[in-house]
């Protein structure tokens, strides 16, 4: 239970946020809680956080990420895109092992959280290792398939869809195109 803090919903207001289990069950001023509990219920919380003087607001969402690429940030970023990809990115990515993408994704997730990013849309190579980083950290992600010239068969995409959507309530999978320069068919 969190009381007496500023909340950024539409307008700044004083209010409360209640969490039951891993779901937000109430946001409001604390007077009309009938949707959450009966009037004569005694509510006992595991903990109450006094956040007076703080601001509670929704987390940011990053809608286009390749999370394990944190290791290439600012690496030869003065090159034109195709030159950067062909000469710098792809050769370095080719040296990665599955476990590397797992730990690089963990690093990226930690960076997201320190920046207020609470969910993302992501795509990257070696997705089984990569997606496990999201499941293990409990970070909300929508993993996209990266349809392109290198894409597996539609059957494999369907298997991935069924498998990844069943891993966690916080993890989902949708088809998505990677980029115009990796897809030759219209």
Q: Each predicted region: which residue ranges?
A:
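Short acidic/polar active-site loop segments enriched in Thr and Asp
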Residues: 118-119, 140
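Short, small-residue-biased leader/transition segments that mark boundaries at the very start
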Residues: 2-9
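Active-site gating loops and adjacent loop-to-helix segments of metal-dependent hydrolytic enzymes
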Residues: 71-103, 137-145, 165
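Metal-coordinating catalytic core of metallo-dependent amide/deamination hydrolases
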Residues: 130-186
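Short, acidic/polar
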Residues: 97-109, 124-127, 152-161
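Histidine-rich, glycine-flanked metal-binding segment
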Residues: 10-57
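Divalent metal-coordination and catalytic microenvironments
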Residues: 17, 22, 53, 64, ...
